[in-house]
Design a protein with these regions (language model features):
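Canonical Radical SAM [4Fe-4S] cluster-binding loop centered on the CxxxCxxC motif
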Residues: 1-36, 48
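Alpha-helical scaffolding within the catalytic cores
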Residues: 4, 93-102
Length: 134
């Protein structure tokens, strides 16, 4: 029996500066997967037929929505669900957030938000609520 799921750390970059986070050094300083690196990973996932769930994390993966959508829309040859771990900053622009969700809602299985007592100083709760309300 193979693995049922896997995670892709898309980027080390993040727009929040949460003090407790290992990625708190600032926005432009970390590695982001190139499209070539990402395709190599996705092709390997395609060769692993037991994987039916991919978690996309970072840093903040939604700094790179085109790469996130590349993961979502890759041809795995089977149904693969996607989860996204985000701070929700992209909910500030409700129209862009709505368009992203509408384009991808059939494949996104879960969006989890980084928000708690440690994050709230750096993350606007309203942005998260905007996404949840879509």
């Amino acid at each position: 029996m193979g693995f049922k799921g896997c995670g892709i750390l898309l980027t080390e970059n993040c727009n929040a500066r949460c003090k407790m986070c290992c990625d708190s050094r600032g926005l432009v300083r970390g590695k982001t997967l190139t499209i070539e690196e990402l395709d190599l990973i996705l092709k390997n996932i395609k060769e692993c037929p037991s994987i039916d769930l991919i978690g996309v994390t970072g840093g903040e993966p939604m700094l790179y929505p085109d790469l996130v959508e590349h993961i979502i829309n890759f041809d795995y040859g089977r149904k693969v669900g996607i989860t996204i771990k985000t701070n929700g900053f992209w909910g500030k622009d409700i129209n862009k957030a709505r368009n992203f969700i509408e384009r991808n809602k059939s494949k996104i299985k879960m969006i989890s938000f980084s928000y708690d007592q440690f994050h709230k100083e750096f993350i606007d709760l309203q942005n998260i609520l905007n996404i949840v309300d879509i």
